[in-house]
Amino acid sequence: MKRKLTALLCASLLTAALPFPACAAETEASLQKVTLNEVAHSIFYAPQYAAIELGYFAEEGIDLELVCGFGADKVMTAVLSGDAEIGFMGSETTIYAYNQGANDYVVNFAQLTQRAGNFLVAREEMPDFDWDDLKGAMVLGGRKGGMPEMVFEYILKQHDIDPLADLTIDQSIDFGSTAAAFSGGQGDFTVEFEPSATALEKEGVGYVVASLGVDSGYVPYTSYSAKSSYMEEHPDIIQGFTNALQKGMDYVNSHTPAEIAEVIAPQFPDSDLETITTIVTRYAEQDTWKENLIFEEESFTLLQDILDTAGELSGRVPYENLVTTEFAENAAK
């Protein structure tokens, strides 16, 4: 009798448990799969990672797959080919594609950062650093035509320094490999994103002497974009995606660097919590993140001015052709 009761109890428990996996499967199936290809995986993009880790994309019905493209050109290729529904990169790339005659051109719908996120790293501490110190130096720079390099050159020109004549900028090293090259002895200075800048400091081979974000002023550095056809066919997904990002932005703007670091730490398993906190603090103090995701027309004009100054603009593009603020405005309500 005892065995019979035990068997019945086990059977009852098993039967009761069956609906839960089924419900979980139904919930998972109801989420829309979206692939986001990001230009780099950096703490610079903390609001995005906060949105991922806090489940905001799932709340908006999105099963987000995050892929790192390691360069804006590669992100754009992924979006145009359909390998990614959404790209996260410097919006200058959308201008290049448009001017090259893309039929189904890629449109920006949300701006995440409003300052450059890279830093100038020297081989020794330079508390009295001046941009003139770069004259005659070898600097490990970024890809020609990319935002990191153009903003760097924009700052140089603001200080009456000719990027071609007054210093040597090495643009031959792949994105993501400059820190290793600098650590190995190449260059007098290097332009680095985080966590590479802090890693060089911890290694004792480099010292941050200037912030390109501070010295360049407010710049529409990185934004989210998708093919115009995809946005027309899936406005609900774009809106849900933007809503999730706005929640991430709200979280970052209302919490301390320590709290933010703890939330996004799973995204950076190779960095300890103290390092992540230091980097978040550095970005927060220079007013990196906007309060909303609206890509203003003045920002787009400034972006084209920077491209023009760098000699990378073949023709001005109308703001309304490559930017929509509809989704960001709705998310900010």
Q: What are the language-model segments listed below?
A:
Residues 1-33, 330-333:
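Short, low-complexity disordered leader/linker segments with a strong preference
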Residues 27-164, 168-172, 181, 188-194, ...:
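Short, glycine-/small- and polar/acidic-enriched structural segments
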Residues 232-313:
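Secondary-structure end/capping motifs
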Residues 49, 95, 153, 198, ...:
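Predominant activation on well-ordered alpha-helical scaffold segments within soluble catalytic domains
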Residues 42, 69-73, 88, 142, ...:
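Soluble non-cytosolic domains of exported or imported proteins
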Residues 84-88, 284-297, 327-333:
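Short amphipathic alpha-helical segments at helix boundaries and their inter-helical linkers
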Residues 93, 124, 174-268:
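Pocket-lining segment of extracytoplasmic ligand-binding domains
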Residues 301-333:
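Conserved C-terminal helix/tail region of periplasmic/extracytoplasmic solute-binding proteins
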